[in-house]
């Protein structure tokens, strides 16, 4: 598939499957994804960071047949709220489409980033929504000291935390942001790299 065809496939998937509730939050999954990308674009002009923000929950949008295919090849399907392992499934799906290691790692890390931030920033954990606090229990709770040190040794750990903070802010009822087509060119650039 060309970058344009892949972008069309992704934008169609988000549009057609994004109208459902965003688990425990007062907005749709699509609105959440668009807001996350909007907040990422306010922080950075880096297309990989912005595209990862837009697609961070793509594992929630995939049809069951795609999830079953991907899940068979994914090593770790640790528990989660919503679709189990959606961050891992989404990262693998994007890798198969041709996205860079950085995009896929940012997507894969948005759940563990919450665990890291809860362990290292008291104000962060105090600011989480009720639904996000509830999901934290299922995601393993705050990281241990050894997990925190390991996290800090990983690639792009600061960007992973920034993306997570965009994710947490992206729950605003009625916030007007750009639509899906706003991100087509960035998606195509990420695929053409």
Model-derived features: positions:
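Charged phosphate-binding loop/patch that engages nucleotide di/tri-phosphates or the phosphate backbone
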Residues: 165, 169-193
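Active-site flanking loop/helix segments enriched in acidic
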Residues: 11-35, 59-61, 69-75
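Aromatic-acidic/polar surface patches that form glycan- and anion
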Residues: 29, 83, 176
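Extended, non-globular alpha-helical segments
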Residues: 1-12
């Amino acid at each position: 598939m060309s970058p344009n065809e892949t972008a069309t496939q992704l934008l169609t998937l988000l549009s057609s499957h994004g109208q459902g509730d965003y688990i425990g939050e007062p907005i749709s999954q699509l609105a959440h994804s668009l807001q996350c990308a909007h907040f990422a674009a306010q922080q950075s002009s880096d297309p990989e960071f912005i595209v990862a923000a837009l697609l961070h929950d793509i594992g929630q949008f995939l049809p069951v047949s795609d999830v079953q295919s991907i899940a068979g090849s994914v090593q770790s399907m640790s528990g989660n709220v919503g679709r189990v392992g959606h961050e891992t499934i989404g990262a693998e799906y994007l890798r198969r489409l041709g996205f860079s290691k950085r995009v896929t790692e940012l997507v894969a890390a948005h759940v563990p980033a919450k665990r890291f931030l809860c362990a290292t920033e008291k104000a962060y954990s105090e600011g989480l929504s009720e639904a996000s606090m509830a999901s934290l229990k299922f995601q393993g709770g705050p990281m241990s000291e050894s997990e925190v040190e390991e996290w800090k040794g990983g690639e792009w750990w600061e960007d992973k935390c920034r993306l997570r903070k965009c994710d947490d802010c992206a729950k605003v009822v009625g916030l007007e942001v750009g639509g899906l087509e706003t991100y087509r060119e960035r998606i195509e650039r990420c695929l053409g790299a």
